[in-house]
C-alpha cells in the first residue's frame, strides 16, 4: 500500500510548530529505528522503562521527532512534548484518517471482547482486530497484542479501507486506552461488556483499571452500548462518565433498565439445553422526535454454548441496531453466528462426553464459563486450569476458589509459567481452596488433559481453561508450540 508523501509540518500540526528550514517531505513513519531510511520519519517516544532514543545508533532518517526530556538527543531532532499520546493522531493524519471512511466499533471490558468482535465481523462481513487476529475472517493475521500500537492500527485501517471494508470491530484493551494506542481512531460505537479483576500487575488497583476502560466513553461517540447488569457498567451511567452527546443503548439479560438509556436491548425466557441457547430478544427504543417508546420482540435460537453468550448475542444485536439493521433481520443473523476459536469451543467425545476449551484466565471468567456450561452438562463437570507466571499473583487463589466452587472435580496444572517455578504458581493457587476434596494437581498441562479425558463418562464435560485459541506455551522466555485442542484431538485418535 503506497502512501503519497506528506510534509513534516502537516503531520506534526498542531503539536509542534516547525521552522521552515526544518521542513521535509515524509514518505513513511515508524516508531522502530530498525525500519529507518532517508525517507522515513522516526517518532521516538518514551516507554515505560526506556526511551526509544536509547536504541538509536545513527541510522539515517528524513527527520527525528522525540519526546522530551532526553539528555542528549541526536543533532537536529525535534522535541515534541507528550509525543506518546499523539502517535495515534499523527499516524491517522499520515494515513488520511481511514476510520472516517468506515464504521469502527470499539469493544472494551474484561470478558467477552474477543467473542463480540468475532460475532460482529461475522454479522457485518467486515474485519476484526483483537486477540484472535487482525483482518477479515477469511484472512486473519496472527495477533501480537490485543490492541496493537497506534501506527499499526492506522496501517491496518488504511489497508482495509483500500480493500473496501466498511465495518471494523476492534478490541480496546485497558493498556491500549492508558497508553493512547487508539488515539486517532474515530469510533462510531463503543461497547462496555463488564469489568472484574484483571491486569492488576499493570494497573494500580481495580479503580485504576476501571478508569482506563472509562476513557473510551469520555469521547463524543455517536453511540455507546453498555451492559447495565454489570456494576461498573451502571456506574458509567450513574456517574455520567459517558459523554453527554452520546446515544446510549443499555443491554441487560436480567430485565434491568436505566433512565439515561435511549434504548434497551434485553433477553427474556432464557433457556439452555443440549442444543444451545434460546431466548426472546426484546428491544425498546425511545424515539428522539416524540419520545414515544417503540417495542419489539422475537425468539432467538443459537447453537452457541454458555449463559454468557446470551450477553454476547445481546451486545451484537445492540450494535446491529445502532447500525440501523432492521430488528426483523436480527434473530436470523444471530442464529447464523458460529463459535469463536477457544471460546466455549466444544469437542465432542465418542462416548457422549465433551471437552470445552475456553480462554477464561481471570476468576470472573472462570466462574462464568463453569456456570455457563453447567446447564448443558447432565453429568459431572470437571475443570482444568492454570495461572500465568510473572503476572498478578493475587488472582491465583481466586481462580482455584472459583474452580472448587463451580466444578465437581478440579485439576490444577500449568498455564504459561514464564520465568516462575510452576510449583510455586500452583502453591499460590492452592491457598484459595478449602477442604481440597476432588482437587488434583497434574502437570505438565498435556498430561493433565490426558489424565482427565479417559475418566469422563457420557454426559460429563471438562472445561479446559486459560489458553483458548493460543497455540503456544511460554516456559522461561521461550514460546513452545502447544494447543489444548490439538492435545484433545491427538488423544481421540491415539490407539
Mark where each language-model region is:
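N-terminal leader/targeting and accessory segments in enzymes
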Residues: 1-89, 231, 266-268, 289, ...
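Phosphate-binding loop of NTP-binding sites
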Residues: 87-228, 233-246, 323, 376-377
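Acidic, Mg2+-coordinating active-site environments of NTP-dependent enzymes
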Residues: 38-39, 60, 70-75, 163, ...
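Active-site beta-alpha connecting loops in nucleotide-dependent enzymes
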Residues: 38, 47-52, 340-342, 371-434, ...
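P-loop/Walker A phosphate-binding loop and immediately adjacent motor/lid segment at beta-alpha junctions
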Residues: 57-60, 75-76, 219-222, 244-247, ...
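Conserved phosphate/oxyanion-binding catalytic-loop motifs
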Residues: 358
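Short glycine-rich anion-binding loops that position phosphate/pyrophosphate groups of nucleotides
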Residues: 47-49, 174-175, 197-198, 230-231, ...
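Short, flexible loop segments at boundaries between secondary-structure elements
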Residues: 200, 483-495
Amino acid at each position: 500500500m503506497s502512501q503519497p508523501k506528506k510534509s513534516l509540518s502537516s503531520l506534526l500540526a498542531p503539536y509542534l510548530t516547525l521552522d521552515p528550514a526544518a521542513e521535509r517531505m515524509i514518505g513513511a513513519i515508524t516508531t522502530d529505528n530498525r525500519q529507518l531510511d532517508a525517507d522515513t520519519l522516526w517518532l521516538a517516544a518514551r516507554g515505560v522503562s526506556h526511551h526509544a532514543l536509547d536504541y538509536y545508533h545513527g541510522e539515517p532518517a528524513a527527520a527525528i521527532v522525540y519526546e522530551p526530556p532526553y539528555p542528549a538527543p541526536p543533532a537536529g531532532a525535534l522535541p515534541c512534548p507528550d509525543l506518546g499520546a499523539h502517535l495515534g493522531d499523527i499516524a491517522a493524519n499520515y494515513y488520511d484518517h481511514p476510520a472516517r471512511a468506515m464504521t469502527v466499533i470499539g469493544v472494551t471490558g474484561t470478558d467477552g471482547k474477543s467473542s463480540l468482535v468475532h460475532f460482529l465481523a461475522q454479522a457485518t462481513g467486515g474485519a476484526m482486530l483483537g486477540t484472535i487476529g487482525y483482518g477479515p475472517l477469511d484472512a486473519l493475521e496472527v495477533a501480537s497484542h490485543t490492541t496493537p500500537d497506534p501506527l499499526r492500527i492506522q496501517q491496518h485501517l488504511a489497508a482495509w479501507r483500500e480493500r473496501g471494508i466498511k465495518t471494523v470491530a476492534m478490541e480496546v484493551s485497558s493498556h491500549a486506552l492508558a497508553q493512547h494506542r487508539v488515539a486517532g481512531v474515530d469510533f462510531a460505537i463503543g461497547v462496555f461488556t463488564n469489568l472484574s479483576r484483571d491486569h492488576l500487575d499493570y494497573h494500580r488497583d481495580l479503580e485504576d483499571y476501571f478508569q482506563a476502560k472509562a476513557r473510551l466513553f469520555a469521547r463524543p461517540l455517536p453511540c455507546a452500548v453498555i451492559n447495565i447488569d454489570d456494576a461498573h457498567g451502571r456506574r458509567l451511567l450513574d456517574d455520567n462518565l459517558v459523554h453527554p452527546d452520546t446515544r446510549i443503548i443499555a443491554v441487560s439479560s436480567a430485565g434491568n433498565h436505566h433512565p439515561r438509556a435511549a434504548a434497551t436491548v434485553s433477553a427474556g425466557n432464557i433457556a439452555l439445553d443440549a442444543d444451545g441457547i434460546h431466548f426472546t430478544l426484546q428491544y425498546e427504543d425511545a424515539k428522539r422526535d416524540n419520545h414515544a417508546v417503540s417495542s419489539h420482540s422475537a425468539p432467538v435460537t443459537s447453537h452457541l454454548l454458555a449463559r454468557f453468550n446470551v450477553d454476547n448475542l445481546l451486545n451484537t444485536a445492540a450494535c446491529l441496531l445502532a447500525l440501523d439493521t432492521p430488528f426483523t433481520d436480527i434473530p436470523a443473523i444471530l442464529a447464523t453466528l458460529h463459535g469463536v476459536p477457544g471460546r466455549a469451543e466444544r469437542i465432542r467425545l465418542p462416548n457422549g462426553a465433551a471437552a470445552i476449551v475456553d480462554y477464561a484466565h481471570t476468576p470472573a471468567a472462570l466462574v462464568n464459563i463453569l456456570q455457563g456450561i453447567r446447564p448443558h452438562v447432565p453429568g459431572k463437570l470437571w475443570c482444568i486450569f492454570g495461572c500465568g507466571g510473572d503476572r498478578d499473583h493475587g488472582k491465583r487463589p481466586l481462580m482455584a476458589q472459583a474452580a472448587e466452587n463451580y466444578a465437581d472435580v478440579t485439576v490444577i496444572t500449568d498455564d504459561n509459567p514464564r520465568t516462575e517455578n510452576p510449583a510455586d504458581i500452583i502453591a499460590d493457587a492452592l491457598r484459595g481452596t478449602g477442604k481440597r476434596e476432588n482437587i488434583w494437581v497434574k502437570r505438565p498441562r498435556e498430561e493433565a488433559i490426558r489424565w482427565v479425558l479417559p475418566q469422563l463418562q457420557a454426559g460429563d464435560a471438562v472445561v479446559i481453561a486459560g489458553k483458548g485459541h493460543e497455540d503456544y506455551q511460554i516456559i522461561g522466555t521461550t514460546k513452545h508450540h502447544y494447543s489444548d485442542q490439538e492435545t484433545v484431538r491427538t488423544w481421540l485418535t491415539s490407539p
